[in-house]
Amino acid sequence: MALCATTQRTIRIAATLRRVARPFATDAVVESDYKRGEIGKVSGIPEEHLSRKVIIYSPARTATQSGSGKLGKWKINFVSTLKWENPLMGWTSTGDPYANVGDSALAFDSEEAAKSFAERHGWDYKVKKPNTPLLKVKSYSDNFKWKGNPQPEN
């Protein structure tokens, strides 16, 4: 079975691209040992934000969802310091540029990845371990089983 000219040309172009692109992909991976806080100094972050305190935690399962899509993720939240009540509207205001960053932006696949990110930026961190509830395996019919005679109250 012969392939049409367009398909043959596409296969040749794909093979050429694989040969050309492979060296660049391996060169892009650079392993480097960073000292604590080194990335923060190079990135242009102001000095007062280099010594921030953060909390690393694994968020609980959403009460309204039964799926496992967001389970196992770790997040970083900044400890907020500068808050005041806006006198006009009564809203809570902040002068902290990182006040709402952790809610959506800083998510990691593992606790170690979150720790290394915080260390590279020079942030002091505290890890909150996830609270896993103990679940009893039982069926609906267990609600109606005979549990013996009632015990007298003392």
Swiss-Prot record:
It is a peripheral membrane protein. GO terms for biological process: cold acclimation; electron transport chain; response to osmotic stress. InterPro entries: NADH_UbQ_FeS_4_mit-like (IPR006885), NDUFS4-like_sf (IPR038532). Coiled coil: none annotated. Disruption phenotype: Leaves have a reduced capacity for cold acclimation, appear water-soaked, leak electrolytes, and accumulate reactive oxygen species constitutively. Sugar-sensitive germination, delayed growth, modified respiration pathway, and altered stress responses. Pfam families: NDUS4 (PF04800). The keyword Cell membrane does not apply. Disulfide bonds: none annotated. GO terms for molecular function: cobalt ion binding; NADH dehydrogenase (ubiquinone) activity. It is found in: Mitochondrion inner membrane. Induction: By cold. Residues 1-24 form a transit peptide. Gene3D superfamilies: atu1810 like domain (3.30.160.190). GO terms for cellular component: mitochondrial inner membrane; mitochondrion; plastid. Keywords: Electron transport, Membrane, Mitochondrion, Mitochondrion inner membrane, Respiratory chain, Transit peptide, Transport. Belongs to the complex I NDUFS4 subunit family. Complex I is composed of at least 49 different subunits. This is a component of the iron-sulfur (IP) fragment of the enzyme. Accessory subunit of the mitochondrial membrane respiratory chain NADH dehydrogenase (Complex I), that is believed not to be involved in catalysis. Complex I functions in the transfer of electrons from NADH to the respiratory chain. The immediate electron acceptor for the enzyme is believed to be ubiquinone. This is NADH dehydrogenase [ubiquinone] iron-sulfur protein 4, mitochondrial. It comes from Arabidopsis thaliana.
